[in-house]
Amino acid sequence: MSKETISASDRLLPASWSRGNPVDIFGDASGKRYADTLAVLIDDREVDAILVLNCPTGLAQPDEAARAVIGALKAAEPTALRGRNVITAWLGEYTARPARQLFADARMPPTKARTAPSAVSSIGYAIATIKSC
């Protein structure tokens, strides 16, 4: 990530964020925090892959986060996304089902991963597939 991305993220995220990769937006993240952070990462040409991972917590709404991510991806300039991997993974079986349906309805189906390790593996597979083409 560029210094500009880290600086912009400092303004968006809690002070205890990692200031590096991976970018943890914390379990209490609102949809706005998802969208704003995603927009900053999309704008950084040094970032070639983004995994948006939502884990169920009692502090945040997965549907709100999904709507915000869909909005941020639709608002992004098509050229900003060209050649970049953006993968979404909404974890959990039942709590995430409505959010995953929102992605499917927006023609942005999330990965079928239901655990964090399998979500991380999915982005590795996507990058390897693209590089082999």
Descriptions of predicted regions:
Residues 64-133:
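Peripheral docking tails and interdomain loops at the edges
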Residues 1-55, 64:
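Short glycine-cluster motifs
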Residues 60:
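Glycine/Thr-rich phosphate-binding loops of Rossmann-like dinucleotide-binding domains
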Residues 46-57, 85-90, 118:
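Periplasmic-binding protein-like
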